[in-house]
Amino acid sequence: MANFVLKAEKREDLGTGASRRLRRAGKIPAVIYGGEKEAVSVLLDHDKVLHSTEDKEFFSSEITLDIDGKQEKVIIKALQRHPYKVKLIHADFMRV
């Protein structure tokens, strides 16, 4: 079983315009929810996530998100892709 570790950063700037700016900068907006904690908006590096999705185990394995130095165990619940480009739009993660 593969061990997936992705670096993430909390994001304060929310909304459609902010998400578009992130995507142009090579980032993916994402949300982490579940458990007893509040939902957290984060951003991830597009190329690293896209490369991870090439491994089929990514979608069924536990993923470790390193959010500003703090480790969080999650699974991927949703991944939105661009209709015709090889580009990711948004990701939803659920805490384990």
Curated annotation (Swiss-Prot):
One of its GO terms (biological process) is translation. GO terms for cellular component: cytosolic large ribosomal subunit. It comes from the Bacteria. Keywords: Ribonucleoprotein, Ribosomal protein, RNA-binding, rRNA-binding. GO terms for molecular function: 5S rRNA binding; structural constituent of ribosome. The keyword Amino-acid biosynthesis does not apply. The keyword Ribonucleoprotein applies. This is one of the proteins that binds to the 5S RNA in the ribosome where it forms part of the central protuberance. Part of the 50S ribosomal subunit; part of the 5S rRNA/L5/L18/L25 subcomplex. Contacts the 5S rRNA. Binds to the 5S rRNA independently of L5 and L18. Belongs to the bacterial ribosomal protein bL25 family. This is Large ribosomal subunit protein bL25. The lineage of its organism: Bacteria, Pseudomonadati, Pseudomonadota, Gammaproteobacteria, Thiotrichales. The gene is rplY.
